[in-house]
Amino acid sequence: MGFQRVSAHTGFLAVSLLVAGTMPATVQAADKKCLFVSSYHKGYAHADQIEAGVRETVKGHCELRQFDMDSKRRNAKEDIKKSALAAKAIIESWKPDVVITADDNAVKYLIEPFYRNKNTPFVFSGLNWTAAEYGLPYSNATGMIEVGPVGVMLDRAASIVPRFRRAFYLGSKTLSEEKNLKRFQVAAAKRGFVLDHALVGSSNEWLKTYAGAQEYDVVIIGNRHGIEDWNEQNVIGEIVKTTRKLSVTNHGWMMPYTILGMTKVSREQGEWAGKTAVRILNGYKISKIPVVPNRQRDVWINSKILAVSGVKLPQGIMRKGKKIAGLAR
């Protein structure tokens, strides 16, 4: 079984060569063919974990090729559309038996406009919060949606912070963060507390906003991906100087900048998608496979930021929470 990867970031010449069929001689033909289309890029922790789950579960069942849309870094709408067209060209030329996708942009720019209710089977994963906005499921598409433990996390924050009334949400200027923010706004309204927010485009803006957010009871840390000038060490250096309030996140890769995390397990998405693809390869009808939400989650603690913040966490959380180690990407 072969594994190959092409990224939009390497230029579309590489894609055209792939479509033309000029593949390395080491790749062996397989009875079944799987294409994995990631919305993002290698090195983005969430995407890497989904990929790992996919690769582990389809291994031995099909020849796997991968295309990375790179839409976090190449995030102009026209660039994303070009990436989607490049993925489409691979599908039309190589004719995979099943296509697995990760995250929203692969659905929005590839599946919905070109393959809705067509013949090619698609298994999506990492789709934020709901599939309804894309009219899913289709006759040829099913998958797993990604639901963050928002309510559980906010309830936990309320149990830690006395007289919790005001929170601040800080994230990046991206489509996925707009969707995440809306979920927190709904949850905040349901629980009767004020939620202010900022979606920013630079690390300086992020740090300035974070410092100002210390006037709130709780700071909710959204995704930083989409902020191109992010410098991990600089951000951490500033955070340890300014943090005075509890910060929470549902993104594992944001734990180097956050006190407490209740996070999704990205690998779960890839494992489910890979296993589902294998079922389809074995003849199971995709129309009988329902769209499902993720179920797994982890609790994380950043002891370094906790120690300088003055925040006290309950002993139960301190015992059960995993301590971060090299999660920043």
Where are the language model's segments positioned?
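Short hydrophobic alpha-helices and adjacent helix-cap/hinge residues
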Residues: V27-R329
